[in-house]
Amino acid sequence: MPQLTTSRVPVGFVEATVPANGITLNYVRGGTGPTLVLLHGYPQTWYMWRKVLPAMAEHFTVIAPDLRGAGGSDAPTGGYTKSSLAEDIYDLLAGLGLADQVSVVGHDIGTMVAYAYAAAHRDSTSRLVLIEAPLADETLYQLPSLTPQGPGLWNFGFFTLQNGLPERMLAGREDTWVDGFVDWLEVVKGGVDEQAIAEYAAQLRQPGHTRASFDYFRAMHADVAETIHHRDTPLTIPVLAIGAEGTLGQMVHDQVVNYANNVTGDIAPTGHWVAEEDPVYLTARLLDFLADDHASPGAQNAMATA
């Protein structure tokens, strides 16, 4: 079994915890400049951003938290609606004095949290990036579990089972589970390396974390109602919607335009795990999008010449 190394945190970053919304959240922080928050997905942690963190920290104060129920954060038995997870992040930023004018980037489950954050904190959210996940609306009920090309998004239904079967299936098999789940959606093989597999499996072995990882999905019925509520008041901030050519593709953009008026779409040359499969692509795309009017003049000039 791959072992975790002691050099998980990139140079220039620190890992810490902070009270937020009644729990304790773990996060890494680095860089200076406007606030940029990176929100991970399932079954990952902040570690999924490790390959893009150094470049982003040259221009931003970067905060990459572990969501409630993941990594080094607490895993209580409730609070997994995406609006609740978004308030966790807002409280974390407020506690650090970083909640004013924030750019938010989400991947997978983090996409749903990022949208909920922007919808709830419109005056203090500058830009939004949504990567490789549908928003939690009626679209979820139309996703096929089986397609002519093979398995569809079967996991959305399986993970919502309330009888403990998903937890029992994973118990003692976390490394095998993460490795197989990642491989299913990975196009650039090895992008999610052995160290990352070990990281994500280890966090699932922490008390309550496997249950919490499925609670993200079990909360989606409530999320659907909350998301639909926001549809009549679309976001006006710039939004970048990224799908991957090996997985969701154009679907991400085509759904997000129903919730925001200023949407740019892009297709990553990867599978689902964009930040790990092609960090060069994602870093360049993020810097280009976030540079337009969000960063300080000095940072904008630096990015323009990078």
Task: Map each language-model feature to its residues.
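A short, charged, Gly/Pro-tolerant segment at domain boundaries
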Residues: 301-306
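A short, glycine- and basic residue-enriched loop/turn
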Residues: 45-46, 112, 271
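Flexible "cap/lid" subdomain of the alpha/beta-hydrolase fold that forms the substrate-access gate
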Residues: 2-17, 22-25, 32-35, 55, ...
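Structural cue for short, hydrophobic secondary-structure segments
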Residues: 38-41, 64
